[in-house]
Amino acid sequence: MSGIRWRLPVLVAVLATTLGLVAAPAQGASPEKQTSPAVSVAAGKVNLGYFVQWGVYGRNYHVKNIETSGSADKLTHINYAFGNVTNGGCAIGDAYADYDKYYDAASSVDGTSDTWDAGALRGSFNQLRKLKAMHPGLKVLFSFGGWTWSGGFGQAAQNPAAFAESCYNLVEDPRWADVFDGIDIDWEYPNACGLSCDTSGFSAFPTLMSALRSKFGSNNLVTAAITADGSDGGKIDAADYGGAAQYVDWYNVMSYDFFGAFDADGPTAPHSPLTSYTGIPAAGFNSDAAIQKLKSKSVPSSKLLLGIGFYGRGWTGVSQSEPGGAATGAAPGTYEAGIEDYKVLKSSCPSTGTIAGTAYAHCGSNWWSYDTPATIGGKMNYANQQGLGGAFFWELSGDTSNGELITAMDGGLN
């Protein structure tokens, strides 16, 4: 599995990091955090979306868009992506976007401008605080790691208690303790290779998650985004996900990015197949294979969320309409070659067929695969039939302005 290769903050985000890498107490405590037990999967199906930190720049996607699209009414949880993992601990990845960016009345989710008062919270954290006030049942988790920032987990695993302490102190910083209801760990990948290779060992992941659960307690959510590589001897087999399941509220199974133009010559294949199909380029690279393998490792179905991509992956130089064709490289994309948002593809390259529970499209010399409202409906039926805890998606800005895809998820789960 390729991992989510496009989790790259823009340059201004990197520069803004210098404004404050780690959290520290500041003037003015945040509103009192609710201490009622975290919402469990048993309370209803989870419909979780990732909100990306860097989306406030080039993508011009803000917390207000979650509200105006109608998505906030359909979400149960939001994962804020990402915090960094460095020097054995959790750290702020972009201080400006997170808690300093000024929102005027027109751009603020509740129509009230930020203030420059000493100790006042701004940025996406304050916008999320306001969104939660508008939707009292909505929960927000702070997600750490991701494709780009997973290299620090190896050091963190050497002293899990210190890592957990660092993360707790950051998530529960008095300035924004009321914003977050828990922590999400996106380690790509324990005891396997992602952007870098980890050699922490089979048991490192459950040891880390145990430390986090011990520190965060039962009143906070502790979750993890995990690989969907269901191949024999693949990434699911590399770490003890079964052993760690007792410590998490659920796993976000990243059942997308199985295939893409990172294999520039093809063969073309859907990046998020629900099942296998004749001619699939790699055995075990499909959602069902991952779900069944995790179940076989004694992970409860109710602790598994099916992953949906709100984007497509594509090739160019393709003459064959059906999957399995040769290509010459990555299709052009708005932000990165080989990747495009659903909101663009639905019009620029409409679906021409389906396979293995997902859609594909051949337009000109380009070939794309992505999920549509119809294929998402089928995937939600699968999630229900398998007794899964719900579903999640990467990520909010890829949907249409009226939330077509999240509406399909909500309707399918409920």
Annotate each PLM feature.
Residues 78, 142, 185, 212, ...:
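Conserved, mostly hydrophobic/aromatic
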Residues 93-115, 190-340:
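Substrate-binding surface in catalytic domains of secreted glycosidases
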Residues 1-31:
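Secretory targeting and sorting signals
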Residues 55-72, 156-176, 230-243, 287, ...:
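Short, acidic/polar
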Residues 39-173:
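Glycan-recognition patch characteristic of GH18 chitinases/ENGases
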Residues 167-199, 257:
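Active-site groove signature of glycoside hydrolases
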